[in-house]
Amino acid sequence: MLKGIKKLFKRSEEVNAKKDVVNIVEPYKVKINTGLLPVRKGPSAEYDVVGAVKENNTFVIVEEVINKNGEVWGLLKAFRKERNGWINLKYTQKK
């Protein structure tokens, strides 16, 4: 019985380790601190680029995700005509 429980627990850990973790946050501002930062369709470099934001510009983040690679990504509020996009928060400074 104990072996079965250990197997089930291990399988659950493996599945959970591959999921993104969503953090609902109060909207906050970030300043871009790299030359040109790609904006993507989802919270990972694996997603298509939908645009880019320039250094020193400020944007509002409305949601955070820690992806399966451990990177923290932020969802931009109303990026380019009401379309939201994701940026890697590693290249930003919280204001």
Residue ranges and their predicted role:
Residues L37, K41, F79:
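Extracellular/lumenal glycan-associated surfaces
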Residues P43-D48:
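Short alpha-helix capping/helix-loop boundary micro-motifs
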Residues G4, A52-Q93:
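SH3/SH3-like beta-barrel superfamily modules
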Residues M1-P38, G51-E55, E64-V65, Q93-K95:
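SH3-family beta-barrel domains
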